[in-house]
C-alpha cells in the first residue's frame, strides 16, 4: 500500500506534517476515507476529529472547520484551528466545555447568539473527544 503526504495547517502555522496510509475526515457531506490514489477533491470540514492511520497506529487531530484538499498523493488540510491529541490540555478543554454550556444556556434564555454558543460547545467537545479516545 502507498502513502499520503499529509499537512494540517492553521492560520497560526503547521499542526501536523507527515506520512499516513489513510486519512479519515468528516466533511459537510459526510465522512471520507482517503487512500493513496484518491480522486482529487476539495471539501469543507466539520468540527470533528481527523484520524490519520500511520505506521505506528493512529493519530487524532481535533479540527475546528476548514477545508481538505486531496491531490494525488497529498492531503492538505487548511483548518480554522487544530490541535493534535498530545497537545490538548484536558483541564482547559473541560473548562471551555463548561463555559460553552453555560453560555448556551444563557443564550437560550436571553435570545442572544445561540449559534456561536453551540459552535463553542462543539469545539470544546471535539477537543475532549480527541484527547480521550483511547
Swiss-Prot record:
Major site of localization recorded for this protein: membrane
Gene Ontology cellular component list: plasma membrane; proton-transporting ATP synthase complex
A Pfam family of this chain: ATP-synt_DE_N
Signal sequence residues: none
GO molecular function: ATP binding; proton-transporting ATP synthase activity, rotational mechanism
Keyword line: ATP synthesis, Cell membrane, CF(1), Hydrogen ion transport, Ion transport, Membrane, Transport
Topology with respect to the bilayer: Peripheral membrane protein
Coiled coil residues, start to end: none
InterPro entries per record: ATP_F1_dsu/esu_C_sf, ATP_synth_F1_dsu/esu, ATP_synth_F1_dsu/esu_N, ATP_synth_F1_esu_C, ATPsynth_dsu/esu_N
Compartment(s) of residence: Cell membrane
NCBIfam families hit by this protein: ATP_synt_epsi, PRK00571.1-3, PRK13442.1
Task of the protein: Produces ATP from ADP in the presence of a proton gradient across the membrane.
HAMAP family given in the database record: ATP_synth_epsil_bac
Assembly behavior: F-type ATPases have 2 components, CF(1) - the catalytic core - and CF(0) - the membrane proton channel. CF(1) has five subunits: alpha(3), beta(3), gamma(1), delta(1), epsilon(1). CF(0) has three main subunits: a, b and c.
Family: Belongs to the ATPase epsilon chain family.
Name the UniProt record assigns to this protein: ATP synthase epsilon chain
Provenance organism: Listeria monocytogenes serotype 4a (strain HCC23)
Gene name tied to this protein: atpC
Amino acid at each position: 500500500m502507498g502513502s499520503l503526504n499529509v499537512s494540517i495547517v492553521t492560520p497560526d502555522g503547521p499542526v501536523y506534517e507527515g506520512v499516513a496510509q489513510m486519512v479519515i475526515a468528516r466533511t459537510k457531506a459526510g465522512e471520507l476515507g482517503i487512500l493513496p490514489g484518491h480522486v482529487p477533491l476539495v471539501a469543507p470540514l466539520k468540527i470533528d476529529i481527523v484520524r490519520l492511520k500511520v505506521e505506528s497506529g493512529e493519530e487524532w487531530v481535533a479540527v475546528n472547520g476548514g477545508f481538505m484538499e486531496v491531490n494525488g498523493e497529498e492531503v492538505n488540510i487548511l483548518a480554522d484551528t487544530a490541535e493534535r491529541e498530545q497537545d490538548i490540555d484536558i483541564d482547559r478543554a473541560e473548562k471551555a466545555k463548561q463555559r460553552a454550556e453555560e453560555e448556551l444556556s444563557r443564550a437560550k434564555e436571553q435570545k442572544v447568539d445561540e449559534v456561536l454558543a453551540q459552535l463553542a460547545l462543539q469545539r470544546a467537545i471535539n477537543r475532549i473527544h480527541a484527547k480521550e479516545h483511547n
